[in-house]
Amino acid sequence: MKKFVKYFLYGLIYLAIIFFLAVMFIATAKADLVKPNNSIEPYQVVKIQLRSLKQNDKPTKNNGIEQTWEFAHPNNQKNTGPLDRFKLMIKGKSYEMLLNHLDHQVVLINSEELVVLFEVTVLDKTKTYYKFNWQVEKYTKNGPLKDCWLTTMVSSPTPLSSSI
């Protein structure tokens, strides 16, 4: 009986160690970014970007900006990149209201075969509303991004009003 109790306790200790290590790994693992694929629709692209920017530093610092970069059209990346420069641009006066905003709405304005335009309204953390035009295009060149919807343009923000 003593051997049974002894091995039972060893088993419990072993399971506790495995559980502890699993929790530590999950807590420290960097979240994988959603990669563009041809099954993600234009509206979803904009929502993925906005949800990520809404919680920019979760689970890691600048994760939202990095997620947004993933869905930037290669031509847009050439104009706004590399990634470190893109991060500075988003954190600058023109787009800082997107970071850690409180709420957003996305409304379809125009949809064509290869280009879709949305009006995005964002409520920033100071409770001011801003409006953007957000355009996505279907990538037509061969390669891993073929037929993926990617952001080609986000307008400068137009301040609307305070929510208070």
Task: Show which residues each predicted segment covers.
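N-terminal Sec-pathway targeting helices
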Residues: 2-14
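Bacterial N-terminal signal peptides
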Residues: 12-23
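Boundary at the C-terminal end of the N-terminal hydrophobic targeting segment
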Residues: 29-31
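TPR-adjacent "capping" and linker segments in tetratricopeptide-repeat scaffold/adaptor proteins
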Residues: 36-38
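Short, aromatic-enriched amphipathic alpha-helices that serve as compact interaction elements
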Residues: 41-57, 67, 71
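Short solvent-exposed beta->alpha transition segments
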Residues: 59-113
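Exposed beta-sheet edge and beta->alpha loop/turn motif
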Residues: 108-164
